[in-house]
Amino acid sequence: MEAVVKTNPYANQENGRMGVANVTFGEVFKARSMNIIKGKNDELFVSMPSYATRKVDENERPVFQDYCHPVTKEFREQLYGAILESFKTGQDVKIDTGTGKDTPDIEVTVVPIEGDNSTKALARICIDQGFVVNNISIKENKDGELFVSMPSIKTTLTDEQGNPEYRDVCYPTTKEFREQLNEKIIENYHLAKDIAMDVADDKAERTGKEAEKSADKEQKGKTSIRGKIKEGKEKAAVNVQQNLADKAKATQER
């Protein structure tokens, strides 16, 4: 499948931020906001868009996670090389993911979220086994309908009410592919929910059986103790009767 890389230089290239890049996969899915940074010795490198997680490192600083990124060394070198080439030449650069198809192959992973909030799950997709998009949300509206929300970042723009505007970092570029992708993500959500429920049922069943076995064992222990007590009482009664018989016999002999 063909992917096209485009870059634009920043008008104000401060703090080493030189430009921004985006890549479109098969003309149906775009990932953008990839920064081109000037590092030491004026060397350029690519920084993927990221967000601060709730985790912190050993210095209590927030840990960042990429919204999207290559997952194989081969595709990372291919993509980053194309971005830097496009930035230096000012031209679009095409790369081939090697699938031989016109549209991307999409693998979906969904993790359901327990609770009563509107976000029901988080999902990630992998494009052609080489590029991952994280932090896709599956949400429920007030009518109980599920919908997919692609990862987005806050911009410097505001709406009419003065609230910050957000824009998607990664998103389908055609209506047809958006519908196909959203349907696939929601299908995988239902599948993940079913699997989670099956696991919970199996766990509950195992817990119930273990509790039943424990109760049976405890009951057998009590029965055993009662049996031993009863056996001891019976032996004591026999001994008493034997002693009385012996005393009676001794009296008769005298």
PLM features: residue spans?
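Histidine-centered catalytic/metal-coordination loop motif
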Residues: 35-85, 139-187, 191
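Basic nucleic-acid-binding interfaces
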Residues: 1-40, 47-53, 85, 95, ...
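Gram-negative host-targeted secretion-system effectors, predominantly Type III and Type IV
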Residues: 1, 85-109, 117, 137, ...
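Polar/charged low-complexity regions in secreted precursors and cytosolic/nuclear IDRs
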Residues: 12-14, 26-28, 42, 57-60, ...
